[in-house]
C-alpha cells in the first residue's frame, strides 16, 4: 500500500487543508471527551511548525445536511484548540468561496455536514474544498470507510493529496496486527450482536489462532448447547455460530454472571452456563471463563480487541471485562484496540498507556479487519501513482 505521507512534503507557505476526525461528544458547549482531538493535534502542530497556512475541518454529530445548526457547530472544538495550541485559532463559517489564512494561524472550517452534498461525495462541493488548498491531508481514519466530499472527493481534485501521520499510523498498526501478526494471535470480539460482527468474526477466524467472543455474541455461542434464559442473543445465528465454533478455535464461556433484570442495581449470581434459568440473563463472563481467557491473552504475541465481554457499565457485571482488559494490558503482546465501547472500557480501567495502539476508528476499524477497501485510502493510493 503506497500513499504520499504528509511527512514527505515541504509545507512551508502552502495552504494545507487537514481533514481530521474531531467528532467529539459535546455537552453545554464543552467537549466532554477529548481523545479524538488529542490524537489529531500532532498532525496540526506539525503543519503549523513547518510554516503552512493551516485549515482543519471535520464533521460533528448528525445535523440535517445543508442547514446550519448551532448544536453541531465546531465552536467547542475551536475553544478547546485555543486552550491547547500556542497559535491563534479561529472558526470560519462561510468558506466555500475561499478563506484567508495567515501563516502560523489555524482556521477551523465549520462542520462539513452543514454543506449540501457532503455525504453524497458531490463533485462540485469536492472541487470547492480542493480549491481552498495546495495540499489536502486526509487524517481521519474514523471516516476513511465513507466516500464523502471531505474525505474522498476533495482528494481527487486537490493539487496534492496525502495521508496524515495519524492515518498512516492507524494503517501501519492494523497492517502489523492483521497482515503479518506475531503468533499466537488472539482476537477478542465483544458487543451485543453476532449479526453486526459476523463478517469480522469470519475474517478473524482465518487470521487469528484463537477468537474470544464476549457479550451478546458469546451468548449466541452459549445457546448452541444451553438454555440462555432471557439473555440477549440471536436465535437466527445459532447455526452459523455452531459452524464457526466447530471449524475454528473459539472457546465458549463455561460460567457466567447472571441477573434477573437488566439494571445497574441487579445483583449478580455466578453460575455454570448449563444452569441458567428461564428468568435469568447472562450479563458477564464468570470467573472461570474470564481467567481461562486471561491465560490465552497472557500467552499471545498479537492481540486485537474490539468490544467488551459483559455489561461493564453496570458495576456488578464489570469483572469479566476488567479481567480481560487487565490481561491485555499486562501482556507482552503487540495489542491494538478499537471501537467506542472498547475505548470507554480502556478509559474506565486506566490502561490507555498499556495498549500498544488504540485506534480512533469504529466502523473503519471493523471494515479494515473485514478486509474491505477503505475509499479514502484507495483514493490516496491512486493519487500517489499520478
Swiss-Prot record:
From the UniProt annotation, give the residues forming the signal peptide.
Answer: none
- Any one cellular-component term (Gene Ontology): cytosol
Kindly state which reaction or reactions the protein catalyses.
(2R)-3-phosphoglycerate + ATP = (2R)-3-phospho-glyceroyl phosphate + ADP
Q: Which E.C. number(s) belong to this protein?
A: 2.7.2.3
Positions of substrate binding: 21-23, 36, 59-62, 113, 146
Alphabetically sorted, this entry's keywords are:
ATP-binding, Cytoplasm, Glycolysis, Kinase, Nucleotide-binding, Transferase
- Pfam families according to UniProt: PGK
PROSITE patterns in the cross-refs: PGLYCERATE_KINASE
| Positions contributing to ATP binding | 197, 313, 339-342
Indicate where this protein resides in the cell. Cytoplasm
GO BP term, pick one: glycolytic process
InterPro entries, per the entry: Phosphoglycerate_kinase, Phosphoglycerate_kinase_CS, Phosphoglycerate_kinase_N, Phosphoglycerate_kinase_sf
The pathway to which it is assigned is: Carbohydrate degradation; glycolysis; pyruvate from D-glyceraldehyde 3-phosphate: step 2/5
Entries under SUPFAM superfamilies matching the protein: Phosphoglycerate kinase (SSF53748)
Record GO terms (molecular function): ADP binding; ATP binding; phosphoglycerate kinase activity
Q: Tell me how this protein assembles.
A: Monomer.
- What does the sequence similarity comment in the record state about its family? Belongs to the phosphoglycerate kinase family.
Task: Report what the protein is called.
Answer: Phosphoglycerate kinase
* Source species of the chain: Serratia proteamaculans (strain 568)
Amino acid at each position: 500500500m503506497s500513499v504520499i505521507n504528509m511527512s514527505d512534503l515541504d509545507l512551508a507557505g502552502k495552504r494545507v487543508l487537514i481533514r481530521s476526525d474531531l467528532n467529539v461528544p459535546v455537552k453545554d458547549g464543552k467537549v466532554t471527551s477529548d481523545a479524538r482531538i488529542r490524537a489529531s493535534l500532532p498532525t496540526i502542530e506539525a503543519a503549523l511548525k513547518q510554516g503552512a497556512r493551516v485549515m482543519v475541518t471535520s464533521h460533528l454529530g448528525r445535523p440535517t445536511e445543508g442547514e446550519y445548526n448551532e448544536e453541531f457547530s465546531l465552536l467547542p472544538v475551536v475553544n478547546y484548540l485555543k486552550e491547547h495550541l500556542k497559535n491563534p485559532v479561529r472558526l470560519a463559517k462561510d468558506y466555500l468561496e475561499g478563506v484567508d489564512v495567515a501563516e502560523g494561524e489555524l482556521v477551523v472550517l465549520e462542520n462539513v455536514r452543514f454543506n449540501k452534498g457532503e455525504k453524497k461525495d458531490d463533485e462540485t462541493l469536492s472541487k470547492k474544498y480542493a480549491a481552498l488548498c495546495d495540499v489536502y491531508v486526509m487524517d481521519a481514519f474514523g471516516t476513511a470507510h465513507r466516500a464523502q466530499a471531505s474525505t474522498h472527493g476533495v482528494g481527487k481534485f486537490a493539487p496534492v493529496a496525502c495521508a496524515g501521520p495519524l492515518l498512516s499510523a492507524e494503517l501501519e498498526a492494523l497492517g502489523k496486527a492483521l497482515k503479518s501478526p506475531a503468533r499466537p494471535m488472539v482476537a477478542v470480539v465483544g458487543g451485543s450482536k453476532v449479526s453486526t460482527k459476523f463478517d469480522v468474526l469470519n475474517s478473524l477466524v482465518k487470521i487469528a489462532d484463537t477468537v474470544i467472543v464476549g457479550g451478546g455474541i458469546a451468548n449466541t455461542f452459549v445457546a448452541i448447547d444451553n438454555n440462555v434464559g432471557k439473555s440477549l442473543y440471536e436465535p437466527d445465528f445459532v447455526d452459523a455460530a455452531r459452524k464457526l465454533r466447530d471449524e475454528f478455535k473459539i472457546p465458549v464461556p463455561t460460567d457466567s454472571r447472571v441477573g434477573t433484570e437488566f439494571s445497574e442495581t441487579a445483583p449478580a449470581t455466578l453460575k455454570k452456563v448449563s444452569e441458567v434459568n428461564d428468568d435469568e440473563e447472562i450479563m458477564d463472563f464468570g470467573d472461570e471463563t474470564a481467567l481461562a481467557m486471561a491465560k490465552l491473552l497472557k500467552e499471545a504475541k498479537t492481540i486485537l480487541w474490539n468490544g467488551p465481554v459483559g455489561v461493564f457499565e453496570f458495576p456488578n457485571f464489570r469483572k469479566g471485562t476488567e479481567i480481560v482488559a487487565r490481561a491485555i494490558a499486562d501482556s507482552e503482546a503487540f495489542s491494538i484496540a478499537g471501537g467506542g465501547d472498547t475505548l470507554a472500557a480502556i478509559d474506565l480501567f486506566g490502561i490507555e498507556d498499556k495498549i500498544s495502539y488504540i485506534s480512533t476508528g469504529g466502523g473503519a476499524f471493523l471494515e479494515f479487519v473485514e478486509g474491505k477497501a477503505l475509499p479514502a485510502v484507495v483514493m490516496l493510493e491512486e493519487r500517489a501513482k499520478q
